[in-house]
Amino acid sequence: MNQLSDRLNSLSPSATLAMSQKSNELKAQGVDVINLSVGEPDFNTPDHIKEAAKKAVDDNFSRYSPVPGYPALRNAIVEKLKKENGLEYTAAQISCANGAKQSVCNTILVLVNPGDEVIVPAPYWVSYPEMVKMAEGTPVIVSAGIEQDFKITPEQLEAAITPKTKALILCSPSNPTGSVYTKEELAGLSAVLAKHPQVIVIADEIYEHINYIGAHQSIAQFPEMKERTVIVNGVSKAYAMTGWRIGFIAGPEWIVKACNKLQGQYTSGPCSVSQKAAEVAYTGTQEPVKEMQKAFQRRRDLIVKLAKDVPGFEVNVPQGAFYLFPKCDTFFGKSNGERKIADSDDLAMYLLEEAHVACVGGASFGAPECIRMSYATSDENIVEAIRRIKEALAKLK
């Protein structure tokens, strides 16, 4: 008899991956599906980065790497943080992993004991609460609705902190909402955290360069917060390198050493060839990053304009990332005569089957009244997707 662990059985499957799989299954059957469920850029990795990887292969750069990554990559990250963020770190305060996802999970696993609480603002990326549960901690969900641009307030943070609180996960720019915390908003959160020195901040900044409101702001830029903050970042989103799997943490050396110890026992260092590519991503020209950001902003403007014209959608303007997160609960309880919509997951499935547009219901993001749409696709796909969605929703009575 097969018996899986309680740890595994406590986890929920990824809704984003599940919807992407269903979309791909329909495509394989010949259905013309427009996929707005994916969380990755639709651009190709810039040529100069690919050339660096090719050279690494030709140079037989194919051995096991040090667990935290090669010094050359970690030093490139140190320079990036200094130049772009005004933050001083040493290479010993950097640990590279197989994507930012592993970097987040490593940090949670080395910090959280059974019974510890981790504050997770909602809407959240689907994996945050599951990672906390994997560490046998308790995710404490703090909800922020569309009326506050999906960003928690200092008062909400203060109310959520208890003696059991070990960490706060803060994602800005946000997946799934595209919300971005301003310097003033981060200052308000920092003032609360100053009263609770036991709380570590895990700052997921993977969408740093897909930001439409100016220079990126990190909570680690506040002097009193730097030694209590673990920055998580990587090359996936900014450089269109999702499959290369390079992420990193920058933070207090005691946490970085712990992550190295943990990672050394289950994956070791990340891919050597990918590290060479990531090194060149950070040290080479940044023009492709700027061009992709401009394209994403144009698409953001387009999808917001079109979605605001969809009856029943409540839309805010995302300030970063490449997601729209409209409120859609006006459709709950309605039917097209064949299917009744109970929640946003039902609505997402209805849109996939009726409009052949893949979106992701908001329940897995901690916001069951919303639905996530990725605009990491062509302008033409955005226009056609919203047309189909509008037509399908009009059938619900």
What do these predicted regions represent?
Residues N24, V78, K82, I108-L109:
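Generic structural signal for well-ordered alpha-helical scaffold segments
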Residues N2-L4, L8, S12-S14, M19, ...:
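PLP-dependent class I/II
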Residues Y64-A97:
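Conserved N-terminal alpha-helix of the aminotransferase class I/II PLP-enzyme fold
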Residues S37-E40, K55-L73:
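A glycine-/small-polar-enriched, mobile loop at the entrance of the PLP active site in fold-type I
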Residues T45-Y64, V78, K83:
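Glycine-rich phosphate-binding segment of PLP-dependent enzymes
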